[in-house]
């Protein structure tokens, strides 16, 4: 009998300890807010209401914490051979298969009241695709995608150092878990996607230090960063990237923005930014709207315009004249989320219009150079959200239009398609 009472007492003490450790709803909300803040890929709208403010003010009970998550995208696909731009006599043939496209492990933590870190891994190439030597890509070693430390001096001034997503426009700063379309856009990372790209990026990431802050009751956000960019000899000028955004309705504090908020948004945000290194510069503006539209659900609109050039000085050691031609890029995404059925149809349009200078085109005729390099992407899809960003299914069709020269040198427009059926699950 004594043993029974002793065991019961120990069980009661354990339950009380768990309850105290849990801290009730307020503590759980603060923990959820910290998790959303440090795991960059989590859309900010998933944080409990008002909990971010509560967490920021709850300094007396601070304890270091660490959080872990994962993002997985896998799909069945069919794609015409000419979709990627390699137009041959078999360009209209359809390739098909299954792929593990994205598998990221996220680790983040609050190290002190004002200091936090975030790390993220990625697959450098999809598992399951066909390699050039007629074999299947089955063994892929993960790479480090993000690795950054943030110190928040105040709400108006924070420093983020390390490897991070770099862009001057909103679409280029979206997190993978909160996309509305099937994938990132084609022309937001055309020159910093890989190590052999002109800006020598890593899936849009770069190494450096970024300053960020919020003013005017959190309505105005600014970002200004110095990054390595293209590093030829260790003496190249640094890459400078800046951005301002004004939220006319609710503030947004996501470091990596959400592409859609699934009925939880009340956002009209306008932004503008620049990106420059050496002779290269990129300036643009963007608009994001996500808010309730009627009783059925909410609308999401994401639009951007960019002008960029690599300059015309071909003699400079750090010139981008022959790598980044003068161009404009237009982008538009539009979708509607039906909250009752949890379905979201969407459409997308992108256009890259090259208008190179003589120095950039080199020995080619400028007109031929512009036609060969210009292209556009359009398409749409249907998303079904089993559990919001945590689990969803996406069916999409995207077409890419190229200008292709025939044997006589005359250009004509060719369009090739891609179909994806994609599953996303996001653990956090």
Feature locations, PLM:
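Bacterial Sec-dependent N-terminal signal peptides
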Residues: 1-24
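N-terminal periplasmic/intermembrane-space "pro-region" immediately following the signal or transit peptide
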Residues: 19-73, 80-83, 218
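Outer-membrane beta-barrel pore domains
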Residues: 24-43, 81, 91-92, 112, ...
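Short, structured loop/turn "capping" segments at alpha-beta junctions
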Residues: 46-48, 53, 252-255, 299
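Outer membrane beta-barrel
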Residues: 55-82, 92-252, 330-355, 373-378, ...
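Active-site flanking loop/helix segments enriched in acidic
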Residues: 86-87
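Short glycine-rich loop/turn motifs
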Residues: 206-208, 257, 284
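Short mixed-charge
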Residues: 250-265
């Amino acid at each position: 009998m004594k043993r029974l009472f002793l065991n019961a007492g120990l069980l009661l003490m354990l339950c009380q300890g768990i309850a105290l450790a849990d801290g009730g709803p307020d503590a759980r909300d603060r923990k959820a807010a910290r998790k959303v803040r440090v795991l960059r890929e989590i859309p900010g709208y998933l944080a409990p209401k008002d909990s971010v403010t509560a967490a920021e003010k709850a300094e007396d009970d601070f304890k270091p914490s660490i959080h872990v998550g994962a993002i997985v995208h896998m799909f069945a696909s069919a794609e015409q051979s000419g979709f990627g731009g390699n137009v041959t006599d078999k360009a209209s043939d359809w390739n098909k298969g299954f792929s593990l496209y994205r598998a990221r492990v996220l680790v983040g933590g609050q190290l002190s009241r004002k200091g936090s870190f975030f790390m993220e891994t990625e697959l450098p190439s999809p598992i399951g695709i066909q390699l050039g030597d007629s074999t299947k890509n089955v063994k892929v070693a993960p790479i480090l995608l993000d690795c950054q430390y943030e110190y928040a001096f105040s709400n108006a001034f924070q420093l983020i150092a390390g490897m991070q997503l770099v862009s001057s426009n909103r679409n280029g700063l979206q997190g993978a878990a909160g996309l509305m379309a099937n994938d990132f856009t084609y022309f937001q990372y055309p020159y910093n996607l890989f190590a052999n790209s002109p800006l020598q990026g890593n899936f849009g990431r770069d190494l450096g230090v970024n300053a960020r802050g919020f003013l005017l009751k959190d309505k105005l956000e600014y970002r200004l960063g110095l990054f390595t960019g293209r590093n030829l000899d260790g003496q190249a000028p640094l890459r400078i990237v800046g951005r301002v955004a004004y939220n006319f309705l609710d503030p947004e504090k996501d470091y990596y923005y959400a592409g859609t908020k699934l009925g939880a948004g009340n956002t009209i945000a306008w932004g503008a930014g620049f990106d420059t290194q050496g002779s290269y510069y990129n300036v643009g503006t963007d608009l994001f709207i996500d808010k309730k539209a009627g009783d059925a659900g909410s609308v999401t609109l994401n639009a951007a315009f960019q002008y960029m050039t690599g300059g015309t000085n071909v003699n400079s050691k750090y010139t981008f004249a022959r790598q980044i031609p003068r161009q404009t890029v237009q982008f538009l995404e539009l979708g509607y989320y039906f909250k009752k059925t949890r379905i979201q149809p969407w459409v997308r349009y992108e256009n890259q219009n090259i208008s190179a200078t003589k120095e950039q085109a080199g020995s080619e005729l400028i007109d031929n150079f512009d036609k060969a390099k210009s292209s556009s992407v359009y398409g749409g899809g249907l998303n079904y959200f089993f559990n919001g960003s945590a689990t969803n299914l996406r069916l999409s069709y995207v077409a890419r239009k190229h200008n292709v020269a025939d044997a006589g040198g005359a250009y004509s427009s060719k369009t090739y398609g891609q179909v994806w059926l994609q599953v996303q699950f996001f653990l956090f």
